[in-house]
Amino acid sequence: MVVQIAKALGARVIATAGSDERVAKAKAFGADEGINYKTEDVAARVLKWAPEGVDMLWESRRETDFDWAVGLLAKRGRMVVMAGRDARPVLPVGPLYVKDCSVHGFAMFNYTAAEQHPCADAINRWLAEGKLKANIDRVLPLREMAAAHQLQEENTLRCAGTLAGKIILRP
């Protein structure tokens, strides 16, 4: 949804994914450019499209490579980190502060219902306008709830790479 929300807000989006199929999916959801981080030089490709660096970098990997990420940020660029609760990566303070960059953590569970309300309104409006579409990876019968949970856990905690979207359970 991050790609679609960024597009709805008017951003130019460069998305990375771990397979050509996932790159194609990101582009289908609105990414202007897509990079397979397993087969391509991400930094070279990003800096080709944004020679001064990017204004915003949204990081959802559990183990963030801050050296790499800060190198891609433009002056006063911002980075949002939304994964890796137990991660302890090295933070390159020098390059970060010299460029006036900032890093922000984002965890939805820290926001109150009142804080989430305007975001929910915007998301509902974009859904109604067709600007957002659900990214469904698979649909499973409700009786396979344990398997669905295991699949989600394998991909969230162990980076299995076998899930690229939401799991829907049907009664």
Model-derived regions, located:
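Conserved helix-to-beta-strand junction in the class I
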Residues: 71-73
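Rossmann-fold dehydrogenase core element
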Residues: 75-82, 91-134
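Short amphipathic alpha-helix with an adjacent loop that forms part of the alpha/beta core around
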Residues: 41-52
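C-terminal hydrophobic helical "lid"/dimerization subdomain
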Residues: 114-171
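Local beta-strand N-terminus motif with an aromatic residue
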Residues: 31, 52-55, 96, 132, ...
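Mid-domain Rossmann-like dinucleotide-binding core that forms the NAD(H)/NADP(H) cofactor-binding site
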Residues: 1-40
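N-terminal Rossmann-like NAD(P) cofactor-binding module of classical short-chain dehydrogenase/reductase
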Residues: 35, 55-58, 80
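Short glycine-/small-residue-rich Rossmann-like dinucleotide-binding loops
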Residues: 39, 61-62, 83-84, 107
